[in-house]
Design a protein with these regions (language model features):
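P-loop NTP-binding core
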Residues: 1-170
Length: 170
């Protein structure tokens, strides 16, 4: 199908310039939202996992035009997120300093590990080799003692994978 050809996907056509110098983006849209269902449908019909490489193929088409390509998939392990995980060479996972978000992130990492192993078995492929995986505190208000305590706990649990720098609440 047309999913395997990034030219037909038209990745160059959907890249938009921003008012920031040398920062382009592909805005989320209904077509990307529908991609979740299209990928699942394609996999069910064709009984193969090649479609999971769709995003990697699209990025390969334009990767030489950029220093860094940042992908921001939904925080769920759907087909689009799996395709992003396959296409990525590094990960930065934002974690707000709340117990619910911390627990959610631990669960997400465990589910991702399991899902990637299943994908490896189903597709007969190796897991992606990431240059790095880092967790970063996000929406942090360092004047709140609870935020400081939870960040400290996250650093103990995640060790060197947790950045010292945080993204503060703005």
């Amino acid at each position: 199908g047309h999913f395997h050809n990034p030219e037909l996907l038209g990745v160059r056509k959907i890249i938009r310039k921003t008012h920031f110098h040398n920062l382009d983006l592909i805005p989320s849209n209904l077509r990307l939202y529908n991609l979740e269902y299209e990928i699942a449908g394609h996999m069910a019909r064709n009984q193969n996992m090649e479609i999971i490489d769709l995003i990697a193929q699209a990025i390969d088409e334009v990767v030489d035009d950029y220093d860094v390509v940042i992908m921001d998939p939904p925080p769920a392990l759907g087909m689009v997120s799996m395709a992003v995980l396959q296409a990525a060479n590094s990960m930065v996972i934002p974690v707000p300093p709340s117990l619910v978000d911390f627990a959610s992130t631990v669960s997400f990492i465990d589910m991702t590990r399991t899902t990637m192993k299943q994908l490896e078995q189903l597709a007969g492929r190796g897991r992606p080799a990431y240059n790095f995986i880092r967790l970063v505190g996000s929406r942090v208000d360092e004047s709140k003692s609870m935020h400081r305590e939870i960040l400290s706990m996250m650093r103990q649990v995640f060790g060197g994978s947790m950045t010292q720098s945080v993204m503060v609440t703005s």
